[in-house]
């Protein structure tokens, strides 16, 4: 089989407070994060949003030590995976490629091309596929492959999603069981799955399979857990005025509190590493909301991180991928051709659902332009005298 490499893909996060602003700019510059009909608007809007959010985001990072632990944990996962693969008889070089911060995916690609690999397994550290996570990284990699003849000669395969992997389900079930057993009455504990949300339009318009995979994953984990505990699935981290997948985590917590739930354990289902969404958003913000709602016993299941069962699951995924027919980036970037890119092939005008979507987007852009002009004091309306 020759020299084997494994490329671990993840989001990335600011290592220190000074990194927050450029990290946010990179994040919102991605058209898979904010989908606009005109690409030339992407970077100006990203700059505006990043400028407005930097201070608040820095305050949040201060609460968890001044930076994200994501890089450190991901690199530890890579080392543990390398050791596990060695134990199973498969030698491999491990590379970490982050989408929005160092080490960037491009940096990882530069390293692996220098190592003259014969086979590469591309493994996103997102159990469930979404156009805004794995899909974004796959599209970037697809472009890099198209631009580099050396990459085109490399044998590779992609693991698009792996939420059904038995070892992953077992690791999650073990982590949940450990937390539940800390309560005085374990069978009464409400298991609360909190997944990172995405705009509803991603699912309904673009065909993102994320919601379906999250729901299936939740059911499989509960089946593996094999306990009578009630459970809820909700979505966190909503940003902006558009509708995201519901129920929202904060609303679901309030509703459970109103129903009299006192014991609750939160499961961060779409996260395999601790980072801002677990350490700050769940542990601090959502804990406060839950306690105010009357949920007095609030615990959180830790992310899998380097849990041995989880690392073994990743190793099994790699070995299985090496022994199966290859799955290419062109396939992974468009899972079953369900995921569409904007703009669509042709514009539609009139009272159709597609036209209404586009009319709404144009109205949204006009609103954004107005807000930017009001904040900056510069723009067309000031030039023609309608605003002073």
Curated annotation (Swiss-Prot):
One of its GO terms (cellular component) is cytoplasm. Signal peptide: none annotated. It is an enzyme of class 4 (lyase). Pathway: Porphyrin-containing compound metabolism; protoheme biosynthesis; protoheme from protoporphyrin-IX: step 1/1. Its main location: cytoplasm. Pfam families: Ferrochelatase. GO terms for molecular function: ferrochelatase activity; metal ion binding. InterPro entries: Ferrochelatase (IPR001015), Ferrochelatase_AS (IPR019772), Ferrochelatase_C (IPR033644), Ferrochelatase_N (IPR033659). Fe cation binds at residues 196, 277. It catalyses: heme b + 2 H(+) = protoporphyrin IX + Fe(2+). It comes from the Bacteria. Its EC number is 4.98.1.1. It is found in: Cytoplasm. One of its GO terms (biological process) is heme biosynthetic process. Keywords: Cytoplasm, Heme biosynthesis, Iron, Lyase, Metal-binding, Porphyrin biosynthesis. Gene3D superfamilies: 3.40.50.1400. NCBIfam families: hemH (TIGR00109). Belongs to the ferrochelatase family. Catalyzes the ferrous insertion into protoporphyrin IX. This is Ferrochelatase. It comes from Nostoc sp. (strain PCC 7120 / SAG 25.82 / UTEX 2576).
